[in-house]
Amino acid sequence: MNITKFFLKDFQPKRLEEDNRKKTDNNLSNIKRYCAKIDAAEGFNGIWEIVKDTVKVSLGKHRLGMLLFLDDLPLHLGAYHQLGTNNIVLNRTLVNIVDSVTKSKKIVNAFVYSILTHEYLHALGHVSESEVRSLVYDISKKCFGEDHIVTSLASLIRQES
């Protein structure tokens, strides 16, 4: 009996070590893939597809039939989702201001990604603002890594709660 315990405790098959390494390598390749996708995304629909994909990968949740609209809203609103609807309304004016001030597609895409992810999480049933801000950060960190602008922006927004 002691021999069996010793054997099981100290024996680590090489296959298990390789499986762990593959999982880490796969996560790094996913981070690179998502970073490349968000940096190259053209238009709101491209970013919207990344939002849905990263939320599904991170939380295992998705919602069909969501519609994205653009409207000119007050500047204190990035976007909104009215509970009970399939609509997310993105503030076109605010996005245009960020675009003209930064002149950086990468920053605009990160900004739009963060706002849409936030509202999509509300649409999935997460009502608490502080919970949603934390989830946006967690999803961003998992999918884009700690050093990407998406995660940096999500971190700043999370600190406001």
PLM region spans:
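Extended low-complexity intrinsically disordered regions
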Residues: 32-87
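Active-site recognition of the HExxH zinc-binding catalytic motif
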Residues: 110, 114-126, 133
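Active-site scaffold of zinc-dependent metalloenzymes
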Residues: 69-109, 113
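Long, hydrophobic, amphipathic alpha-helical segments used as structural scaffolds
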Residues: 55, 59, 124-128, 147
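N-terminal low-structure segments adjacent to metalloprotease catalytic domains
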Residues: 1-30, 34
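Hydrophobic (often cysteine-bearing) scaffold residues that line and stabilize catalytic clefts
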Residues: 43, 47, 109, 113, ...
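Post-HExxH zinc-binding segment in Zn-dependent metallohydrolases
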Residues: 127-161
